[in-house]
């Protein structure tokens, strides 16, 4: 059920924060935004503007936004995309009392338009020191967090796996949109080599196949069929978030295979659920993973290295389970949603 539209009566005067999500497609940015927004709404008078509003935060629409014009008391406009920064800059120029904040996850040099937009912000958050290093101004580093209650290990992982009615005893997964940037092809290549040697494992790919990636996905399916592994490499397509959480709980091993990434939320989601990790050196992997303790790192784009790193865990599921327990503790200690919310809240308070 959607939260009610909030801007009525005194709410327009009390509003402190607008969380923007001006994007039609559900993405990793949307996921991180949705997770932390209700926590922030517990600390500030907040409203969500845009699609995919989560429970726990009031919603607003364009009509509600119009009611804030020429209000004296400032309101934080928290943007995570270029179009949201553009909207904030324009509204502020036209008289809306906005304090502009941008969260940057990109680990690359920004385009000129993004650099200009960033220069117009009142404050910047970077999701890692690496992301901060690409900015031309100071930023507060606040790493992403995950809801460790929702992404929790199952009481009985064997029973959780059995619910899926898949062959074998263990699951190894790779989650995210099916495309080359996410390295789905690397995972398929590794599984085509490893699964024949480890019959107790089934591989699961969870993520959307967008229209522009149908050809890419069909080529993966051809490889899987040629290897005779149609029943042991399962591509689910896009799933509701509660189904995705259920799949995390079934995993013994998680492969993070991105060639490039901003942060890579699936890293900490899988760790929180107690999966052992093998990850490419993309996004926040080098920050999140303790090499040899909570996971292992491999170069990006290297299917052979990925295969080599995954095999010892598939050979010894008990060792993978122990590594997953350390991974879970690492998230509890360093990457909880509460810690992220506290870090963002400190920036908000400076702006207000």
Q: How would you describe each model-predicted region?
A:
Residues 217-238:
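Nucleotide-activated donor-binding/catalytic signature segment of Leloir-type glycosyltransferases, i.e.
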Residues 312, 319-334, 340-343:
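A short, well-ordered alpha-helix in the C-terminal region of glycosyltransferases
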Residues 276-280, 289:
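Short hydrophobic beta-strand element within catalytic cores of glycosyltransferases
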Residues 259:
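Aromatic "clamp/platform" in nucleotide-sugar-dependent glycosyltransferases that forms part
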Residues 238-239, 246-251:
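Short alpha-helical donor nucleotide-sugar binding micro-motif in glycosyltransferases
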Residues 291-292, 296-304, 312-318:
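Conserved acidic donor-binding segment of nucleotide-sugar-dependent glycosyltransferases
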């Amino acid at each position: 059920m959607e939260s009610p539209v909030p801007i009525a009566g005194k709410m327009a005067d009390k509003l402190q924060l607008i969380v923007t999500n001006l994007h039609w497609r559900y993405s990793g940015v949307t996921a991180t935004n949705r997770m932390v927004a209700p926590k922030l709404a517990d600390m500030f008078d907040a409203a969500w503007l845009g699609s995919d509003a989560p429970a726990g935060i009031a919603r607003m629409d364009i009509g509600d936004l119009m009611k804030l014009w020429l209000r004296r008391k400032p309101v934080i406009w928290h943007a995570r995309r270029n179009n949201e920064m553009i909207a904030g800059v324009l509204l502020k120029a036209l008289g809306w009392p906005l304090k502009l904040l941008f969260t940057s996850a990109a680990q690359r040099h920004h385009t000129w338009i993004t650099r200009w937009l960033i220069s117009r912000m009142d404050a910047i958050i970077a999701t890692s020191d690496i992301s901060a290093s690409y900015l031309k101004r100071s930023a507060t580093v606040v790493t992403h967090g995950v809801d460790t209650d929702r992404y929790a290990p199952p009481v009985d992982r064997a029973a959780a796996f059995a619910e899926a009615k898949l062959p074998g005893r263990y699951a190894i997964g790779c989650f995210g949109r099916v495309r080359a940037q996410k390295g789905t092809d690397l995972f398929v290549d590794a599984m085509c080599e490893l699964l024949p040697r480890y019959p107790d494992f089934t591989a699961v790919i969870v993520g959307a196949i967008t229209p522009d990636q149908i050809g890419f996905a069909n080529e993966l399916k051809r490889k899987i069929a040629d290897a005779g592994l149609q029943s042991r490499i399962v591509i689910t397509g896009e799933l509701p978030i509660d189904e995705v959480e259920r799949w995390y709980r079934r995993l013994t091993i998680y492969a993070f295979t991105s060639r490039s990434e901003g942060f890579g939320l699936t890293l900490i989601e899988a760790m929180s659920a107690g999966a052992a990790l093998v990850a490419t050196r993309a996004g926040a992997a080098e920050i999140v993973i303790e090499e040899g303790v909570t996971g292992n790192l491999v170069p990006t784009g290297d299917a052979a290295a990925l295969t080599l790193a995954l095999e010892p865990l598939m050979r010894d599921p008990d060792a993978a389970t122990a590594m997953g327990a350390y991974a879970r503790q690492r998230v509890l200690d360093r990457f909880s949603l509460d810690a992220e919310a506290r870090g963002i809240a400190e920036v908000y308070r400076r702006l207000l």
